[in-house]
């Protein structure tokens, strides 16, 4: 039986297309593709990573499975052949790195049915890029894992029917569409962090500093989002 996934990776796995070949970019130790194949969620998987150390560990981990998972050295999507998988996951890396991988690998996105993304920050940049590249968001979830919160979003080919607002790009249109206690907690923590920054400027007698005005605007935006949800 494959190793149990963390809450974060389990949320990613739940959005992978069942019964369809997949590839995991930045696979590290190939835990996600090994779990998906081991549980027969997908028929085959490719683990892609640029670092030789994790690749060695990944190859050793999947060698006892008897097939189904291929480990391949790749800088982003570079070694993926267009059409050989139907779903791609990219998890656990910064959003701006994700944008660079997706933009550079655009030809290899042709024929994909789903891209599942879990950025570590930079979510606004990722959403903006996916919309620009002609994809639309079809599923999204917030997940708490230990002391951190993560966003997992699935994208399908084809442009978004409706334009995204600034708030949609910041927090995620589908995240905003449903009453999620975790989202409310996230907003409250985000507001508390910004208020702390503002109080420090006030303590330093810097209320008139441009940064203070920006923080007050930030607080107003978060409060408006909180008010919309209650």
Q: What function would you assign to each model-found segment?
A:
Residues 29-41:
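Conserved SAM-binding loop of SAM-dependent methyltransferases across substrates and taxa
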Residues 44-49:
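Conserved SAM-binding motif I beta-strand of class I
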Residues 84-92:
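Short SAM/SAH-binding signature in class I
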């Amino acid at each position: 039986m494959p190793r149990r996934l963390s809450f974060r990776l389990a949320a990613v796995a739940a959005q992978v297309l069942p019964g369809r070949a997949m590839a995991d970019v930045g696979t590290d130790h190939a835990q996600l593709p090994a779990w998906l194949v081991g549980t027969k969620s997908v028929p085959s998987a490719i683990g892609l990573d640029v670092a030789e150390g994790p690749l060695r560990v990944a190859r050793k981990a999947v060698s006892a499975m008897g097939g189904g998972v291929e480990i391949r050295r790749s800088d982003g999507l570079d070694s993926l052949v267009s059409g050989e998988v139907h779903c791609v996951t990219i998890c656990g890396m910064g959003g701006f790195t994700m944008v660079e991988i997706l933009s550079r690998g655009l030809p290899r996105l042709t024929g994909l049915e789903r891209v599942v993304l879990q950025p570590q920050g930079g979510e606004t940049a990722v959403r903006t890029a996916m919309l620009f590249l002609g994809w639309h968001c079809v599923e999204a979830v917030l997940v708490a894992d230990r002391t951190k919160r993560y966003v997992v979003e699935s994208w399908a080919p084809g442009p978004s029917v409706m334009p995204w607002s600034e708030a949609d790009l910041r927090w995620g249109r589908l995240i905003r569409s449903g009453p999620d206690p975790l989202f409310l907690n996230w907003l409250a923590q985000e507001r508390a962090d910004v208020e702390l920054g503002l109080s420090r400027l006030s303590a330093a007698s810097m209320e008139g500093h441009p940064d203070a005005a920006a923080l007050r605007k930030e607080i107003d935006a978060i409060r408006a989002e909180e008010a919309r949800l209650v």
